[in-house]
Amino acid sequence: MAERTHACGKVTVEAVGQTVQLKGWVQKRRDLGGLIFIDLRDRTGIVQVVFNPETSKEALEVAETIRSEYVLHVEGTVVERGEGAINDNMATGRIEVQATKVNVLNAAKTTPIIIADDTDASEDVRLKYRYLDLRRPVMFNTFKMRHDVTKTIRNFLDTEEFLEVETPILTKSTPEGARDYLVPSRVHDGEFYALPQSPQLFKQLLMVGGFERYYQVARCFRDEDLRADRQPEFTQIDIEASFLTQEEILDMMERMMTKVMKDAKGVEISAPFPRMTYADAMARYGSDKPDTRFEMELTDLSEFAAGCGFKVFTSAVESGGQVKAINAKGAASKYSRKDIDALTEFVKVYGAKGLAWLKVEEDGLKGPIAKFFGEEDANVLMTTLEATAGDLLLFVADKKSVVADSLGALRLRLGKELELIDESKYNFLWVTDWPLLEYDEDADRYFAAHHPFTMPFREDVELLETAPEKARAQAYDLVLNGYELGGGSLRIYERDVQEKMFKALGFSQEEAQEQFGFLLEAFEYGTPPHGGIALGLDRLVMLLAGRTNLRDTIAFPKTASASCLLTEAPSPVAEAQLEELNLKLSLKEEK
């Protein structure tokens, strides 16, 4: 078999007159009665191959048997197309290949999905036949983008003198957040490894080990409820460094992301990135990962609501809640009563009891709650919300967390529906000064807002024992267009501070020693100050490639139920395998 001389998408007018050897898949076959045209595809693109009896009867006879997705080896001569046959939509649209020989390397059944960017296949079918789905150019281009992003990051970190170090996949189960995936040990009866949720502890131990600068393209595993932007196994760019301040880490990440955007996407972005505290983000956007590509910020009306005539507002404030509103500029005529009812049902998903609304008309406020506001109150509302005729005012009165969640989500929905979002923008943002701990009323205990190894502000360390809810974290999240790209922090590196953190989280001294004794002991051998960040590679690629589903950036992803439709994993295993592991199944009976 002759070697391939050209990739299909790279045969240009410079090759006219040359004999070329091409290999690829049949994208399309057209029989024009005596002439057969085949679009031959490989990962670089498509080239048109012509089978003409005047050139080769033998090649034409073979071409008559060829169908879509057959794998071919074609030998032929490159010729220029006639003036009326030029296709400027193709890189190879000015030439075609007159076939002199063709060899069918492999035949193909009729594929269950159309191999084209615009496929009509359902996602389940695409996942079941993922190897066919990956043939679509849009999928290849996504993974080329992923490769380019990863290569740029590796090159950047190499110039910054970081070492790429692999950390264990089989490790110890520790209570860090989500459920662990467990792996039974054959050698140690009744004991289990866990797949890592992140390399957090190992990268800190590498800092104890004096490596100073580490990174890893790390596989992580979390057994949690899945959403469109979550997978049970995912990849993060894991970075840790000793002796750097928070400012130095943020500056380095800005330089890295600027290079990624330029090299992998061809987009120039400016640094430093804007910064916003966690409290400010929640107050203004109702989200800890705000999309700043459009306005429509939340406005706090609690002070006004406390003295107004609308009892729903006043009672919310009196019970310790708040009232906030968003002004959808010029949207009054675009939302009917039925549309607003749909918005009301939408905010209820986020815990809101309802959605109050007003439309601003030339002669004042109109809507179900307009009667509760006299002229003076109406003027205050209009002024506070910067409202003018044609605006739609939307209010939620409830607990602070419910107000933030519901209005934050409503803001994003309105931004999309009103086409306020400039999709060409890439708005990076740092969200800083996070709370260190969050209180869970159901569990009646504190949980780490990020993870238990985050360093509090020095002046807040004592609050861990007196008022944990007031302690602030030296933590930072990188946000892009309303998505959390990653999170990081300075880490605790002193045993006494780490023990105070564990105590605030409800660990007894014995529990802390049992779970994290190896880390606590490591802190007694001269641990340097250190910090880092972990960036979600899958999510970053999703945003840069313009995809809407994280699964499109992972070669062989899982479904929302954490199953693989291609391999049918997870699956039962043989009884003999369980016996080797000294395991017995005790399945719950279906009710």
UniProtKB/Swiss-Prot annotation:
> For the region Aspartate, what residue ranges are annotated?
200-203
Look up the record and give one Gene Ontology term from the biological process aspect.
aspartyl-tRNA aminoacylation
Where does this protein reside within or beyond the cell? Cytoplasm
Q: What cellular component GO annotations does this protein have? A: cytoplasm
Q: Which residues form a coiled coil?
A: none
Spell out the reaction equation it catalyses.
tRNA(Asx) + L-aspartate + ATP = L-aspartyl-tRNA(Asx) + AMP + diphosphate
Q: Which residues bind ATP?
A: R222, D223, E224, Q231, E484, G536, L537, D538, R539
Q: Where is this site: Important for tRNA non-discrimination?
A: G84
Query: Where, by residue number, does L-aspartate bind?
Result: E176, R222, H450, R491
Q: Which InterPro entries match?
A: Aa-tRNA-synt_II, aa-tRNA-synth_II, aa-tRNA-synth_II/BPL/LPL, Asp-tRNA-ligase_1, Asp-tRNA-ligase_1_N, Asp/Asn-tRNA-synth_IIb, AspRS_core, GAD-like_sf
Single GO molecular-function term?
A: aspartate-tRNA(Asn) ligase activity
Class of this enzyme: ligase
Pfam families, A to Z: GAD (PF02938), tRNA-synt_2 (PF00152), tRNA_anti-codon (PF01336)
The principal location of this protein is cytoplasm
Q: Which key words are in the record?
A: Aminoacyl-tRNA synthetase, ATP-binding, Cytoplasm, Ligase, Nucleotide-binding, Protein biosynthesis
| EC number of the protein | 6.1.1.23
So what does this one do? Aspartyl-tRNA synthetase with relaxed tRNA specificity since it is able to aspartylate not only its cognate tRNA(Asp) but also tRNA(Asn). Reaction proceeds in two steps: L-aspartate is first activated by ATP to form Asp-AMP and then transferred to the acceptor end of tRNA(Asp/Asn).
Q: Which family does the entry's similarity section mention?
A: Belongs to the class-II aminoacyl-tRNA synthetase family. Type 1 subfamily.
Quaternary structure, per UniProt, is:
Homodimer.
Q: What is this protein called?
A: Aspartate--tRNA(Asp/Asn) ligase
Q: Which gene encodes it?
A: aspS
